[in-house]
Amino acid sequence: MKTKLLSTLIALLSLTMNVFGQAKKPTLMILPSDNWCEQRFFMTEFDNQGTKQKVPNYKQVFQEDVEIGQVISKIGSVMIDRGFPLKDAEQELKSIEARKAEDNMTSSTTSGSSISESPLDKLQNKAKADIVIQIWWKVNKTEQGKSVSFILEAFDAYTSKRIASSTGNGTPNNTDIIPVLLQNAILANIDPFAAQLQSHFDDMFNNGREVLLTVKKWNSWDKNLETEIDGKEITDYVNEWLQKNTVKGRFNMSSATENIIRFEQVRIPLFDANNNSIDARQFAKGLQKYFKAAPFNFEVKLMTRGLGEAIIVIGEK
């Protein structure tokens, strides 16, 4: 009897350890901060539908800076030691350059209306990391030797919201190279930072990933979002679909007119039935299919900006 009870307890303990050992960790991607790139003139202009914006030129960073590869490798090893899977930004950039099959510019085949994405949007779409970590550092010279000051910030790759940060200064010495000085400085401050990352991901795991969703109409369409179908406005159908398909029915309609509806804090599942990550595009495909079927039979265009914003446009494709 005791032997059987002991065997049962061991089996339960083993199962419990296995469950905790398989706890999901967010996938990370490490990049230099915008400010670091600006200070070193690694910037380029991006034409955002007629508006010029300065954005980091990550390709140039990895090609020309002698320290960034080592720095990212050192920080990456610190995060991997804590169980976080990592996406290699440099390799993802090379993959984007190698393919160049499309320029990530989407347009209506009827009217030519378009939506553009920044280089970071394209990189995040390719890598599909959950969290982007940005690093800034500066080398200080003291009587005791060189030291580094650093700022480590983490952003939700889907919403661009800051979710964790850490700052600090390393111990001066004249023997270690900059990447090692930086690694040691970060190690002394990393545990609270890692805890913030895990807390954010745990919230997503329980309450869904946050994305943005916009539903709008083409100007050429003969209906609008207040048009009634079988006694209900199109806007009402959108709300009902979101109630059924978001996690715990959580979303916020921030604005609604006859031409456009904007939803914020739309909580979508992290994974599908096959345990693959779901982004805003995959989620919005369900709404696209919904409106393409009876009783609507609409032409529907699906566009995205980055991983976390989907735009459904009704009336053309």
Task: List each language-model region with its residue ranges.
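N-terminal segment of the mature soluble domain
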Residues: 44-126, 132, 232-293
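C-terminal/domain-edge helix-coil "capping" segments
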Residues: 22-42, 161-250, 305-306
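Amphipathic beta-strand/beta-sheet edge segments enriched in Tyr/Trp
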Residues: 131-175, 305-317
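C-terminal basic regulatory modules in eukaryotic proteins
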Residues: 286-317
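Short, flexible helix-coil linker/hinge segments at the edges of structured domains or between repeats
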Residues: 92-110, 155-178
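Bacterial Sec-dependent N-terminal signal peptides
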Residues: 1-24
